[in-house]
Structures are given as C-alpha cells and as structure tokens.
Amino acid sequence: MFDKLAAVAARYDELTELMAQPEVATNVTLLQQYAREQREIEDIVNAYREYQATQRAIEEAEAMLEDSDPELRALAQEELETQRKRLASLEEQLKLLLLPRDPNDSKDVIMEIRQGEGGDEAALFAADLFRMYTRFAESRGWKVEVDSLTENGIGGIKEVIFQIHGEGAYSQLKYEGGVHRVQRVPATEARGRIHTSTATVAVLPEVEETEIEIKPEDLRIDVFRSAGHGGQGVNTTDSAVRIVYKPGTPEEIVVTCQDGRSQIQNRERAMTVLRARLYAREQEKRQREIGASRLAQVGSGERAEKIRTYNFPQDRITDHRIGQNFSNLPAVLDGELDKIIEALIIYDNAERLRASGVST
C-alpha cells in the first residue's frame, strides 16, 4: 500500500511541475487535464503526507521517553498515545481512499418512484417518498426537475420521474433503489388496523450523450397533448413526448415526459432518462457477468429488493441491508436522511475494503 501511496504523491508533485511549464500554461486543454488529474489524487496525497508527519511525531515522542525529566516523559507518553491513535485512523482513511471510486458518484441523478402493493395507501406512500427526496435535495441546495408525474386524485402518486442536479447527488442517493415498505394505519381505516404497502424506487446516474450510443432508427417518437396532474388537460399544443426504444422487441423501453415547458425540453429530458436506463441495463448485465456479490451491490437499485421498512406505530425505520434501525420517522420523511445514508456509506466502504483485500 505504501509503495502505491509514494507513487501517487510523486505523480502529484510531477503534475505541479508540469503545470508550471510555459508550454503547458498556454495550452488550456492540457492544463485542464493535468489539473483534473491532480484534483482526483489530492485527498490521497494530503492524507498520506499527514500520515508521514504523524510518523515523525511518534518518533520524536519516542525519543523524548528517554529524557531524564519525569514530567517531560509523561508528556511524551501522552503525545505518543494520541499520535498512535491518529496514525491508525489515517491508515484506515488511506485504505478507503485507495479503493477505486465509483465513476458515477459525481453525476446528477434520475429517480423513479412507483406505487407498489397496497392501492391508494401505496400511492400516498409514494408521494411521501417523493417529498422526502425533494426535501433532502433542497436542504443541500440541489435542483429538482420533474419529468413526469401521474397522481391518483387523492394526493397520492402512481408514478413520478424526476431529476436531481447537484454535486455528488448520485453518491448520496444511489443506495435508495429498491422496494420501500410502510406499515401504518391509513386515514381511511376506521378500525385502526395497520396496513402494509410498498413503493418502488429506481436510482439512475445521469449519462452523457457520448457514454451511450443510441441509433435514430431504434427510436419511435410520439408527441401528444400534455395532461395536468390528475389527468386534467392543460395544454393546447402537442408538447408531451413519448420515446419508445426498439418498439415491439424484448429490449423495448418506453419513456414519457410531459412536465417540461416545450416539446423540445420534454424530448431532451426523455432522452436523458432513456440514456440512464440503457446505461443501468448495461451495468446490471456487466455485474451479472462478473458474478458480483450482493453485499458489494448495496446501491445496485434493483427494484425487486426490499431494502427498508417504515414502521409508523413503533416510530422505527429498518434498513434490511445493514440490519440497522433508526428513529424519528417524521423527520426522516421530511428529508433528514443523513444518518441513514452515512450508515450505508460506512457499510459499503467496509464491504469494499473486505473484498479488495487492501493491506499495508
């Protein structure tokens, strides 16, 4: 591990020297390339140099233990214990930093929420989840754009497709894909019986046009009059867009977008969703081919996987992937997802470390 760290630090210094050269400083493309590469390894280099400084501090403290002054020796012992703890912490941090990064972590995200089993109560729960993710995004200053929304007429959501734009959006929300289950007494339940309902969530990284090739001949594009929420017509022009990829084949994908201001905007958004779905399909195929373990796929987003239960009577949220419970359910549904996401990231990192076999 430390040989690799030394090589990364040497490359960082080399990049600094390269960017100072006149022929590079005047070449914008090359300068940006070097700057991007340096940013990607900056955290590793900073942690490694702090590790080296901590090692030196330990050596100095050990030398002070030989001093004749008992007070100085006591101070040295205290410093030694502090620095050794810091060294162990930095070593774990470096192991994590050396793990391959998910190339999608910095991307924006596309989310799809659909009501599952449970009728109207499932649709109401889907609306709760949509509000939860919207509030979570807003608390971070991220932008939310709705591509398509189908309501059930009583405040519930049958299906919603939306995009979240913000730094690291996918890295935070990629763990939300799967089946979410709610246990509560519906407002319409006169006898106070607890009902169980579900909603499915899909999480997709937004994909650049250059990352996925889509042939025009594989598409059928329909335009129609946009409908308002609840099915009410609101538009006198054919602004809504439906894109069908490879219609009539097993590979068919249908994407509809009608919440944009124009047909052009709806078409662009629909293509964005289509690219994301095709990318996700390719990723899932690749994972199956290499036999990736389920433990290493906490954020796989498979819709058949029950990932979390929201138990209202007991004010308890259980994430089944990590076997951990969380309280204060109303706050979580109001967007306070930080503790849950942090626990999932810690679990995922630990599993990746175990699978990688990184050692010193």
UniProtKB/Swiss-Prot annotation:
Residues where N5-methylglutamine is found: Q232
Subcellular location: Cytoplasm
GO CC, alphabetical: cytoplasm
Alphabetized GO MF terms: translation release factor activity, codon specific
UniProt-listed Pfam families: PCRF, RF-1
Entry-linked Gene3D superfamilies: 3.30.160.20, 3.30.70.1660, 6.10.140.1950
Modification comment: Methylated by PrmC. Methylation increases the termination efficiency of RF1.
Keywords: Cytoplasm, Methylation, Protein biosynthesis
HAMAP family, per database record: Rel_fac_1 (MF_00093)
Family indicated by similarity: Belongs to the prokaryotic/mitochondrial release factor family.
Function summary: Peptide chain release factor 1 directs the termination of translation in response to the peptide chain termination codons UAG and UAA.
Protein name in the entry: Peptide chain release factor 1
The species this protein was found in: Chloroflexus aurantiacus (strain ATCC 29366 / DSM 635 / J-10-fl)
